[in-house]
A protein has these predicted regions:
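Substrate-binding clefts and substrate-entry loops adjacent to catalytic sites
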Residues: 113-118, 155-190
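Short, functionally critical alpha-helical segments immediately adjacent to catalytic or ligand/cofactor-binding
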Residues: 132-156, 199
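Non-catalytic cell-wall polysaccharide-engagement segments
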Residues: 39-80, 173-292
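Long, low-complexity serine/threonine/glycine- and acidic-rich segments characteristic of extracellular
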Residues: 292-376
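Solvent-exposed, acidic/flexible segments
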Residues: 59, 120-128, 137-142, 162-165, ...
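C-terminal segment of classical bacterial N-terminal signal peptides
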Residues: 16, 25-35
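N-terminal export signals and maturation junctions of secreted/periplasmic proteins
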Residues: 38-129
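N-terminal secretory signal peptides that target proteins for export/translocation
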Residues: 1-12
Length: 376
C-alpha cells in the first residue's frame, strides 16, 4: 500500500499508451496491440479515480485474456540472463525463479465468506489463473488486480522480479510505518496467492464497513498528499465506493507536481500510488471513469490478411443490452463501420439477459506498410 516497494522500483516507467493496433498489411507481420488510450495525468479526478462499474466487475477478463496480457507486457522473461540468475542475491532479497507471465504455484483452498466466494486451490496454478479466480470469487476486476500488482511492485512489466516483489505483490499488510515512512510488511501475508486474495478481499471489506475507515464515499474527506504530514492535506469529495477503497488502500492524493510530471517524479511532497493507478488503467484499458451506460466491448482478435486486416469481438450498450450497437474502425485516413449483431457469447456472459448476438467481425482493405488501427 506504500508508494515504493523495492530497490528496482519502475513505477514511473511509461507503459504502452494507445488504443491501437500497429500492423503490416499484405500478411507480413502483426507488430502489437494495446487495448487503451494515451494517459494524461492532468485528467486525474481526485474524487473519482475509477467507477464502481469497472472496479467491482469480477468477470472483466478471462484467465486466457489475463495470460495474453501478461505475455504482451513481458514478451521474454530475462531471468537466467547474465547477471540475473534465479536465486542470486539482490539487495536484501534475491532474484525470483519466474516472471509473472510464467509464474505458477500450488494454491490453497479458501472457504467462502461474506466478502468472497470459495476459492478451490490446486497444484501448479498460474498467476493468470490466480488473478482470475480471485477476481471472480471476490467481485473485483482482474484489471484492478493487474494494476495493483504493477503500481505496488511493477510485477506485470518486470522481466526479472525479486522474491520480495512476489512476497508482497499487492502491498497488502504493508503500512507506511517503517523508518522514513517505508513499507513495514507483515510476513504472515507473504506469497502471491495470499497477496492477490487479501487485496481483493480487503477492497470488499472496505465497502461492507464504510464507517470503520478514515475515507468515506459520498462526503468530503481530508486526504494527505504524502506520508509525511508536513506536506499538508486537501479536501476531496469522494464520489463512489471504488475511489474510497483506493484511498483507504493507498491513503494519499497526488499533488500538482506529481500530476504535472505525468509518469515522472514530482517534488518531495509528491505521491504516486493513486496517480499511477489512474495512469496505468488509462494506458492499458481505457478510461477508468466509464459512466454507467457507456457502450462497452472488446476486440478479441486482429490479424493481417492479403490486402487488409480482419478483426472480431463484441460490443453492447449497458442501457439497452438487447439492442445492437455500431462499431467504427479507423486506419490511416480511412474508416469503416459494422453492427455488433452476430453470434458471440462473451457479452451475455458479462451481461446476463443481453442475448447471444452482440458480436462483430470485419474485413478491411488496407494498403501495404505499417497501419495504425483504432476501434470504437
Amino acid at each position: 500500500m506504500t508508494e515504493m516497494r523495492h530497490g528496482r522500483s519502475r513505477l514511473l516507467r511509461r507503459p504502452i499508451a494507445a488504443f491501437t493496433a500497429v500492423i503490416m498489411a499484405l500478411g507480413v507481420s502483426y507488430l502489437g496491440i494495446s487495448p487503451a488510450n494515451a494517459a494524461n495525468a492532468n485528467d486525474f479526478n481526485a474524487g473519482n479515480i475509477i467507477s464502481d462499474e469497472l472496479f467491482y466487475d469480477g468477470y472483466a477478463m478471462s484467465a486466457a485474456q489475463v495470460q495474453d496480457f501478461l505475455n504482451q507486457r513481458v514478451p521474454r522473461c530475462t531471468i537466467g540472463d547474465p547477471g540475473r540468475t534465479a536465486g542470486m542475491t539482490w539487495g536484501n532479497t534475491s532474484i525470483a525463479n519466474q516472471c509473472l507471465r510464467n509464474y505458477s504455484m500450488n494454491t490453497v483452498s479458501k472457504a467462502a465468506n461474506p466478502y468472497c466466494g470459495a476459492y478451490v486451490g490446486r497444484a501448479n496454478e498460474t498467476a493468470a489463473e490466480i488473478i482470475t479466480k480471485v477476481a471472480q470469487a471476490c467481485g473485483i476486476s482482474q484489471r484492478v488486480l493487474l494494476i495493483t500488482l504493477e503500481k505496488e511492485q511493477s510485477l506485470v512489466t518486470d522481466s526479472w522480479p525479486t522474491v520480495r516483489q512476489i512476497d508482497v505483490a499487492t502491498g497488502y499488510a504493508c503500512p507506511d510505518s517503517g523508518p522514513n515512512w517505508s513499507a513495514n510488511c507483515n510476513p504472515e501475508y507473504y506469497g502471491f496467492q495470499n497477496q492477490v486474495y487479501y487485496a481483493a478481499w480487503q477492497f470488499k471489506v472496505y465497502k461492507a464497513f464504510p464507517s470503520s475507515y478514515g475515507y468515506k464515499p459520498f462526503q468530503t474527506n481530508t486526504i494527505q498528499y504524502n506520508p509525511n504530514p508536513a506536506c499538508g492535506t486537501s479536501q476531496v469529495y469522494i464520489e463512489n465506493w471504488a475511489t474510497a477503497a483506493l484511498y483507504i488502500y493507498t491513503p494519499y492524493r497526488p499533488n500538482q507536481a506529481a500530476l504535472n510530471a505525468q509518469w515522472g517524479v514530482g517534488d518531495s511532497c509528491s505521491s504516486y500510488g493513486n496517480r499511477n493507478f489512474f495512469m496505468l488503467y488509462s494506458s492499458w484499458f481505457g478510461s477508468p471513469t466509464l459512466a454507467a451506460g457507456t457502450p462497452t466491448g472488446e476486440v478479441k482478435e486482429l490479424w493481417t490478411v492479403n490486402n487488409g486486416i480482419r478483426l472480431w469481438g463484441w460490443a453492447l450498450d449497458p442501457d439497452s443490452i438487447t439492442s445492437p450497437v455500431q462499431i467504427h474502425v479507423r486506419f490511416g485516413t480511412s474508416w469503416a463501420a459494422a453492427t455488433a449483431d452476430q453470434p458471440n457469447s462473451s457479452a451475455e456472459t458479462l451481461y446476463p439477459g443481453s442475448g447471444p448476438n452482440h458480436g462483430f467481425g470485419m474485413w478491411i482493405t488496407a494498403p501495404p506498410g505499417p497501419q495504425q488501427v483504432c476501434v470504437w
